[in-house]
A protein has these predicted regions:
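Short, conserved catalytic or interaction motifs in soluble domains
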Residues: 104
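Portal/gating segments that form or line small-molecule/metal binding sites
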Residues: 1-101, 111-161
Length: 161
């Protein structure tokens, strides 16, 4: 369940990258955060990041822009030695799921019904059956659920969502 800490890199779309940078970049933090967020903040701040964007001209925060064909770029990232790449957000994971490039899915379910907001995988062109492989109850009441596509049980150099 520690996919972000174990991943070799993070793969974000522009919106998620900008949101994560605003929230977790330690060198620009102006508001004190609760102590329990520090391990996550240090992990995300130090991680290598790849940003898929056709509108950004440059990125920093230990990041590199991904240009060109998404499938080719992600397959190249997955071929690199290591434990894999973690992704998050709404739009990019949908595109990766459509391409069959996600080896593991991790969903954090919070004990709150919002009634609005983006829907994950909205518009997915085909049904994707998943098998639960792990779960973790968090102190906040949230539950982390880890799945793999039903036809797949083990992973290597995964792109996790």
């Amino acid at each position: 369940m520690e996919n972000i800490a174990q991943a070799d890199a993070l793969l974000f779309g522009r919106v998620t990258y900008e949101m994560m940078e605003a929230a977790w970049r330690l060198s620009t933090r102006t508001v004190a955060m609760p102590d329990w967020t520090e391990p996550f903040a240090r992990t995300i701040d130090a991680a290598k990041k790849y940003v898929v964007s056709s509108t950004l001209d440059h990125v920093d925060w230990n990041a590199e822009l991904v240009r060109g064909d998404l499938e080719t770029a992600v397959r190249e990232l997955k071929q690199q030695p290591g434990r894999g790449v973690f992704t998050g957000g709404v739009t990019l994971p949908l595109a990766l799921a459509e391409l069959g490039l996600i080896d593991e899915y991790e969903f954090i379910v919070h004990p709150r019904v919002a009634g609005h907001g983006p829907r994950l995988f909205d518009g997915l062109s085909k049904r994707l059956d998943l098998t639960l492989v792990d779960r973790l109850e968090l102190g906040s009441g949230a539950v982390a659920l880890q799945y793999v596509p039903r036809a797949q049980r083990s992973t290597g150099n995964a792109v996790d969502s």
